[in-house]
Amino acid sequence: MTLSTPTGLAGFDDLLSSHVVMVTGKGGVGKTTTAAALALAGVASGRRTILVEVEGRQSFSRTFGTARWDYEQREFRPGLWGMAIDPADSVYEYLDRFYGLKRVQWVMERSHALDFVTTAAPGLKDLLLLGKVYDLEIQRRSDGRRRYDLIVVDAPPTGRIVPFLQSPEGVTEIVRVGPIQRQAGSMWEMLQNPQRLRTVVVSLLEEMPVQETIEAVHALRELGVDVGPLVANQVTVPRVSEPQRDQLRDLGASGLREQVTKDGARMSGRTSQLLLDLVRTHRDQVELQERLRDELVGSCALPLLALPLMTSPTFEVPDLEVLADVLALQLGEDGPHAQARFDDTELEAAIAAARPSTVSGGTS
């Protein structure tokens, strides 16, 4: 099966062309889920991948059913590693690497000095977290190849992503010499290089998330960080067409009941009215999605990938594999898990619902 593909994206080599993919989005839109799906897609494409969290929420350990993630890089699935970056571990590693002062860790922990420093120096905590991402990006294996082909970071939400990424620039303005200044400068170079890092912004096709996504994209561009694609999450699959909606509306509750009776079935007046209300609500949701997708892509001029709304009572790894395959299918790659969950018509309808036909950044 081949789904319609957004302009500017041709396969995983394009989507995952940057070494580091920072996934951000307004809280509650599913950025963590999207980050996990992207990581699984990376593994499916043959890339050694590490999935990184920086906010200490342990979302991935719960989702994948592993022990708590910490500062150690552990392979928890074939080809997929995970770690949780902690500012304290980052600063202890930094002190040991540049000054040989790992012995001060005990003193800092007892005196709560680290809490004082990170509070007194705005941006330092973000710099420590981002510094470890930079460290992962430059790591090499013994044969000179990168330790990881792909680094997927569940980044801070859109309300914090710019200060998070801006932290190296802020530090270089304060610290003019020394290893901190040099490393901050190197981190800034990584952020400005699209081959090394890009941001993927996740949104729901709802009013507030779309507006915040547009603002975040513009702010990231002003910062000089590569952005794209966008991901529309929890897209409602259109199951009733506009002509079908109009036909049912013209029939009305009594007409629908009469038609059902002619076909040899029975339907109460209450049930027929409920059905009409459900159809109207569904079509209203679909049409709202269409309007907001055009606003989103038109304002950002970026390709848009879609992830369908999943109706599972619990969200587990097989669901993530389905979403990873939905991404794959939109890029012309194989997606067996998605095709086992959705039929071709449902998948195409979900993708089409988030694919603008006339505005810049999309294709029919």
State each model region's role.
Residues 97-137:
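ATP-hydrolysis module of ASCE/P-loop NTPase motor domains
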